[in-house]
Amino acid sequence: MIKAVVFDLDNTLMDFMRMKRAAVDAAADAMIDAGLNIPKKELVEKIFTIYWKEGIEDQNIFDKVLQKEFGRVDPKILAAGIIGYRRAKDGVMTLYPHVRLTLAGLLKAGVKLGVVSDAPRLAVWLRIVSLELHHYFEHVVTYDDTGKRKPSPEPFKRILELLGVSAKEALMVGDWAERDIVGAKKMGMKTAWAKYGDEFKTVNSGADYELLDTQDVLAIIEKENGRRQCL
């Protein structure tokens, strides 16, 4: 019986890469408007090159790009980029369809809810609260809570302990097969791959279930628990 569902956050509950691309695009426009002499497409590519190398959560991304490409960090250019980024990010941070419907249905069925994210603690909570999801989740585990990223067993162990369930009583939902699915399966959890959020052109997720929509989780719980709980 599934007693708890654990969700990844980015590209599982929220459309993170849509937000990231829009925010970087706006930041590039703002820096160029402030006097940075570089084609926009080239600047965006340089930003993402460093993101992919050093981490998509890098909080000093614009400093690094400016220092690497121009030999100095102009505070006016930097400020313009940060402000442009923040304004765009807040404007396009959105949930995938049916997320609230799904979470409400799970809670109605008596299923505990948690989040495991590789992002820093404050960044995770800013997203959760901004999206008004903080009332749904009993516990949230971030990178700062264990110092380990998925597929390490530590984040999964922590969330299972906090939720008070065994691995076989939990379902992990995530978009990144190599982290979310592999890590959870090694722990003995059931797994559901959020295909709708896949950014890696994954061919075989290895998950027990594949989701085309978040509300597919409700059908999984009904199947696993043997009764229609989530209506």
Where are these regions (language model features)?
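N-terminal helical cap/lid subdomain that shapes the substrate entry/recognition surface
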Residues: 2-101, 122
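Asp-based, Mg2+/Mn2+-dependent phosphohydrolase catalytic module
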Residues: 1-5, 17-18, 68, 100, ...
